[in-house]
């Protein structure tokens, strides 16, 4: 009724021991470590069970991965030999805007990099993070400075046709004349403040407050009150 089975001891050794004898597995062949998978798998992305790719956008993958050769070497050489590929270290194989695909899609400065002559050096010099070039100061000749000083003595503000005529007579642009007059007015105001000194500035402030007091109290006075005197 019951099939005869071999007797088993209920010792720890008999319970832990395996019933089947240990079989040696086949040794790993060196050719099994060759990474010869097609590079198209990088472009298509890993297919999830739901059927959606983790990398749906092909722009996220560098174009160098398509040209990679399959890696085949012995297991003991993996830790000793450095992996250097010419596609990553050679400038002749590097795409100009491969690492900056968002630059061409930007509506503010994307039009500046359209064309075949775009390089990474151009991107660093004229890109969004490039420094603004300093404005070159105009070196005026002595005769030009003399004419400009005379025009400033007549009028501190030269605009319109007068500025255009002055610029043409001095072989300068209107922007250069405009900037010179702006700087000259700033220098003139600074010189006036230095000549007047702090005492004159304080007296002007005092007279201003006195005039406001007279207007508020409807009082008139022909003489000026010295606000700097102690009396």
Curated annotation (Swiss-Prot):
Residues 193-231 are annotated as: Disordered. Pfam families: Homeodomain. GO terms for biological process: brain development; central nervous system development; neuron differentiation; pronephric distal tubule development; regulation of transcription by RNA polymerase II. GO terms for molecular function: DNA-binding transcription factor activity, RNA polymerase II-specific; RNA polymerase II cis-regulatory region sequence-specific DNA binding. It is found in: Nucleus. Its main location: nucleus. The keyword DNA-binding applies. Keywords: Developmental protein, DNA-binding, Homeobox, Nucleus. The keyword tRNA processing does not apply. PANTHER family: HOMEOBOX PROTEIN EMX-RELATED (PTHR24339), HOMEOBOX PROTEIN EMX1 (PTHR24339:SF26). May function in combinations with OTX1/2 to specify cell fates in the developing central nervous system. This is Homeobox protein EMX1. It comes from Danio rerio (Zebrafish). The lineage of its organism: Eukaryota, Metazoa, Chordata, Craniata, Vertebrata.
